[in-house]
């Protein structure tokens, strides 16, 4: 009798778990995206080598511009780009404006309180970019009174620099303005940024160079970002990131856009 009762309870539990798993899958963004045939992807269109809109063609160019198309193709759906920024992407995800953010988002502990991150695909740290002939000669010149340091508003570098700088003035720059423009117009003495943005400055703006700190600062993984509470969707995105690492698509896309040195292993 006891064995019969336990067997019955186990069977009921299995049925309940199966039903719960089935309901979870049906409610997942993975199911909804494949059913609708459209993947809405949040992207900041001002990120060099990551997701930069070409002013001549209007097309998005960069590693995530390429890889977002790969994800949509692997899912068998169309890609719909939803423009966002570092200051608004969390609210956009929470408001269900997109299923995923793909634009070099730094996976920080603070952001992880509001969204979930995939396995990392890039890893970078803080770089300083300055003008030749400016007041900054080496790293020790940065944190001094009278020095204006520009950062992108909402970037992971902004809160780090707030804690790091003791004497210099920190100026967060909100889109559509850019920290690069602040530097070149001499409103800023130096900008704090990541590898992709430092790469852009030294390639596109004559008379600029970047400085590395004596030791790496704010080493941060870049990952894809999804809303909280959808483990099925997050599992799929994680598997996809692992897949493009193994099949070479991540390395190839990074190499096309000069990001080979910061590919996550």
What are these model-predicted stretches?
Residues 24-104, 256:
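Extracytoplasmic small-molecule ligand-binding "clamshell" domains
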Residues 24-28, 156-173, 210-212, 242-265:
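Ligand-binding clefts/hinges and TM-proximal coupling segments of bilobed small-molecule sensing domains
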Residues 36-43, 140-154, 169:
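Short loop->beta-strand "edge-of-pocket" segments that line small-molecule binding or catalytic clefts
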Residues 39-40, 76-78, 84, 94-103, ...:
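Alpha-to-beta junction loops
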Residues 65, 69, 73, 78-141, ...:
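Acidic, polar ligand-binding/catalytic clefts
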Residues 66-74, 140, 152-155, 221-261:
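Extended ligand-binding regions for polar small-molecule ligands
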Residues 87-88, 104-113, 160-163, 184, ...:
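A ligand-binding cleft/hinge motif common to bilobed small-molecule-binding domains
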Residues 122-132, 195, 199-242, 260-265:
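Periplasmic-binding protein-like
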């Amino acid at each position: 009798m006891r064995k019969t009762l336990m067997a019955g309870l186990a069977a009921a539990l299995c049925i309940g778990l199966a039903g719960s798993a089935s309901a979870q899958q049906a409610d997942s963004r993975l199911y909804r995206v494949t059913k609708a045939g459209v993947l809405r992807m949040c992207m900041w269109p001002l990120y060099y080598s990551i997701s930069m809109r070409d002013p001549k063609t209007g097309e998005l160019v960069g590693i995530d511009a390429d890889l977002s198309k790969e994800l949509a193709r692997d899912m068998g759906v169309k890609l719909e780009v939803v423009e966002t920024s570092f200051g608004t992407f969390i609210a956009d995800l929470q408001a269900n404006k997109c299923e995923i953010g793909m634009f070099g988002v730094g996976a920080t502990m603070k952001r992880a309180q509001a969204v979930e991150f995939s396995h990392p695909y890039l890893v970078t740290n803080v770089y300083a970019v300055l003008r030749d002939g400016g007041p900054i000669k080496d790293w020790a010149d940065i944190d001094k009174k009278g020095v204006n340091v520009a950062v992108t508003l909402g970037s992971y570098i902004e809160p780090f620099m707030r804690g790091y700088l003791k004497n210099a003035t920190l100026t967060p720059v909100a889109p559509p303005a850019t920290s690069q423009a602040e530097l070149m117009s001499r409103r800023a003495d130096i900008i704090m940024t990541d590898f992709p943005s430092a790469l852009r400055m030294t390639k596109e703006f004559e008379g600029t160079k970047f400085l590395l700190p004596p030791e790496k600062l704010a080493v941060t993984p870049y990952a894809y970002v999804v809303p909280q509470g959808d483990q099925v969707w997050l599992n799929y995105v994680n598997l996809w990131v692992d897949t493009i690492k193994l099949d070479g698509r991540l390395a190839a896309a990074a190499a096309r856009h000069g990001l080979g040195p910061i590919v996550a292993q």
